[in-house]
Amino acid sequence: MPSLLSLVLTFLAVSSPSCCQNSDTASPKASNGASFPWNNMRLPEYITPIHYDLMIHANLSTLTFWGKTEVEITVSQPTSTIIMHSHQLQISKATLRRGAEEMLPEEPLKLMEYSAHEQVALLTAQPLLAGSVYTVIITYAANLSENFHGFYKSTYRTQEGERRILAATQFEPTAARMAFPCFDEPALKASFSIKIKRDPRHLAISNMPLVKSVTVAEGLIEDHFDITVKMSTYLVAFIISDFKSVSKMTKSGVKVSVYAVPDKINQADYALDAAVTLLEFYEDYFSIPYPLPKQDLAAIPDFQSGAMENWGLTTYRESALLYDKEKSSASSKLGITMTVSHELAHQWFGNLVTMEWWNDLWLNEGFAKFMEFVSVTVTHPELKVEEYFFGKCFNAMEVDALNSSHPVSTPVENPAQIREMFDEVSYEKGACILNMLRDYLSADTFKRGIVQYLQKYSYKNTKNEDLWNSMMHICPTDGTQTMDGFCSRNQHSSSTSHWRQEVIDIKSMMNTWTLQKGFPLITITVRGRNVHLKQEHYMKGSECFPETGSLWHVPLTFITSKSDSVQRFLLKTKTDVIILPEAVEWIKFNVGMNGYYIVHYGDDGWASLNGLLKEAHTTISSNDRASLINNAFQLVSIGKLSIEKALDLILYLKNETEIMPIFQGLNELIPMYKLMEKRDMVEVETQFKDFLLRLLKDLINKQTWTDEGSVSERMLRSQLLLLACVHRYQLCVQRAERYFREWKASNGNMSLPIDVTLAVFAVGAQNTEGWDFLYSKYQSSLSSTEKSQIEFSLCISQDPEKLQWLLDQSFKGEIIKTQEFPHILTLIGRNPVGYPLAWKFLKENWNKIVQKFELGSSSIAHMVMGTTNQFSTRARLEEVKGFFSSLKKNGSQLRCVQQTIETIEENIRWMDKNFDKIRLWLQKERQELL
């Protein structure tokens, strides 16, 4: 997981959608030209794996490995064909034993391969009998992957400059088949016995503890690992390296260890302590003991995503696990804690109970994202993570407001379609609708439901409806009040008594959130004591919403000027009326932003709330203030609110001190001038940036150049000083220049305050000498935070040659790791000097980029959006359309392409409608902030 609310707040973060492509529907032909006996991306249901015996022998000198897989299977109907997954494996021999005993004779199997589906067919001479057990034995060899998936090569350099090689795995979603032939679908769970052959100077680790090590030849050791629990193939993991480790025990006797390269093992203590605390929390919260004897956390030098939940051996980017007490930032501590929490939550949600198929990935990822906040709120209260949750919902809404979005639960089939599911909708929206349900039912009732779900489906697979059925048992629909009244609610209504009892049908309610895309816009119109409600599908791209037929069961919450007690109302129809006990001056819906919807206040509703913010903004919570900012600008996009009124509302920020309203204000305002930077609008762009600095000037001037304060205060300081320095606020620039001179004079040995380092580096990188010095320190730094800060600073250079060099070197991966390339490309794509270079680089190197990062991956989506989605001219739109349409199957159908095209179209409409209004508003309001 990237550091929360970090660099991207200044250079607008892009979404991480993925892509899809159609499966091959032609008559299948095997690699030898013969007819392949199976024509489906999914494996047949009549063969089930029971147990795998895996032997892996990797040679880290030749970068090859060979393996032997013995898989015990059962057959439910007679067949002469065994269909398995295999990708880029050279199978040399395949045999069959008719039984599970090793002493039984082996008979040869005829092998056929169909690479389009990444499948092999093993044909038997005599049919397999229903109800019988068989063992398939396959011997094979392959190259270690040069990418970030399968069984792949990773490298690092020691402090002395020696290059060392290790091998690690990343199998989710469909890459276990790149390491061993298998039944690579999440519902085909089995147990695994793993043996690894290695050089004596290396260490092997896997899902389970080491049972014994045997010397099988001179210079060759075979490690035997304990048998696993029943689990999906994508959770298998093994690493061969020279890592060092530190360990602790949980109260229940689970050994927790953190592994890292030797030079960085001193940065493992924070994650180790966090992991122990979080594992103990989850065992208590879920009322289910962690089922394995150990939990390893390994920091991999080359890693495409943030982390991976392999059962018993979670893997991470170094930046997502290692914490340097001297140099790591407050946001880094927050990010590491959340990432460790996420992966450990998966040990229950995802590993113990797994979605049946990838269409319900959100059952894994939405829950893990949600549990990050539930757990860390308790285990690390000083981080105040509850303040940041609603920001995840805004991220999801950015994607979910587009026509190219998809339901939380949506059909997928081929690997690229599966990879596209790893996006904001599965993660953030999934988490947000769970939080909304928890808020509505109460934390205790919700917890009872998910514990029942986990207990019922342990070591099994589930579908969307299984979760809601578990909740239904907690909240029956027979009209009786249970669980302290949480399942039958009294709520305001338009009935003559002003109250009615509302029975909650969890399944029907939540299906409206998981089986249809998008989210509702709730329009509130107050007439005396009557509050008129209307819901419609919020969708960008039109000021007149199409009648989609979408209807949600919306658990509304509200407070008023007369009562800060949260009131609730379940809106299940297109319109309804709430009758208040008395007239009110203002009403605020979606309290705390716990609901996944946005609100428009009709008539003078926005004027009342604007007045509240100007006169007494602390009357409502900081989350409520931030949600008003977000909702106002979302309404500008669809023509429900004028840009002038939204900008008027945000003027109150000159009196704001809390992190989330300020960050939300920046998230709304920065994209506006980023659009202007890419067009010839220098005068208004400059005026807008000046306005932003004046708006926050008092707060910027109050920032100390220290590391004092809470995590949120430190994160706010870092971002405000960076903003001020990047926009050449002289008080900031002068101090940053002085710090940089002193730091450079010390050859980078002087300790800078961590919170101001980013601003100092950003200023220092603006001349050639400073840029070159920063790059030299990047090469030798052992701190992930410091490397990230330098990387950002190098990317905001105004020197096109430097920017082009960064693109070239990060893509080659020799000096700057290839895993950094998507981020570097996106940062340069946000740079007003660099964006043409980034877009050109993406186009010219598309085929190579897809080979490195896989069609459908979130990295590809990140790069597509990051280089194009701040365009706002018709010429650029046609250029983007033309390029991607020319790719055909190699990219034209990517969801991220549809998203960026929609976004550019929206940018064009937005600028056409609002640019002149902003120019006039700036002239009118200029004096107000002086």
UniProtKB/Swiss-Prot annotation:
Glycosylated residues are: N59, N143, N403, N655, N749, N890
Spans traversing the lipid bilayer = 3-23
Q: Which CDD domains match?
A: M1_APN-Q_like
Q: Required cofactors, per record?
A: Zn(2+)
Entry's InterPro entries?
Answer: Aminopeptidase_N-like_N, Aminopeptidase_N-like_N_sf, ERAP1-like_C_dom, M1_APN-typ, Peptidase_M1, Peptidase_M1_aminopeptidases, Peptidase_M1_dom, Peptidase_M4/M1_CTD_sf
Expression tissues: Ubiquitous.
> Can you say where in the cell this protein is located?
Endoplasmic reticulum membrane
Give me the residues that bind substrate, please: E172, G306, A307, M308, E309, N310
Lumenal topological domain residue ranges: 24-930
Entry PTM: N-glycosylated.
Q: What class of enzyme is it?
A: hydrolase
| Full protein name | Endoplasmic reticulum aminopeptidase 1
